[in-house]
Amino acid sequence: MKIEIVVGNIVKQPDIEAVVNSANANLRLGSGVAGAIHMAAGPKLEEDCKPFAPLALGAGLITPGFKLPNPWVIHVRSAHYINNDEPEKYMQMALESMLRLANDNDIRSLALPAIGTGMFKFPPILAARITCQVLHRADELAPFLQTVRICLTDAAMLELFESANAEVQMTTIG
């Protein structure tokens, strides 16, 4: 599986099958990336999510992309870093849920943001490490998946994720 790390707008990835939404428990329009995904997808996305709320910590859900250029949206719920005893565990579970949903739906390409680093206050370096660790085990959970694109907001986040990815790659190989 190929991991791409880019600075880019997650709602403008037309060559990707599913975008990943860092969702709140109620699966409602929020701010940041979740807000951008909901706005771009249109009101049907929130309507489609309603019956599945509240989404459990670490869980995921797949819905159509509606007005997005992507057929699917995978919603995952990580934990608030500050108000939770095991935020790293739930971040890992959310990312694993994302991979399982991709596999179960024969999705070959995903675009995800820096899960948890906005409203959930995850330290970006920790989020980057956990994300890269899970992605380097993706073949176990999602053998069908070919490409994962991590879409980040700026060069500083790009540098953090590239560094974490290189670090995880070194430990996996060595």
Give the ranges of each region predicted by the language model.
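Phosphate/ribose-phosphate-bearing ligand recognition and processing surfaces
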Residues: 81-174
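Glycine-/small-residue-enriched capping loops at alpha/beta junctions
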Residues: 1-105
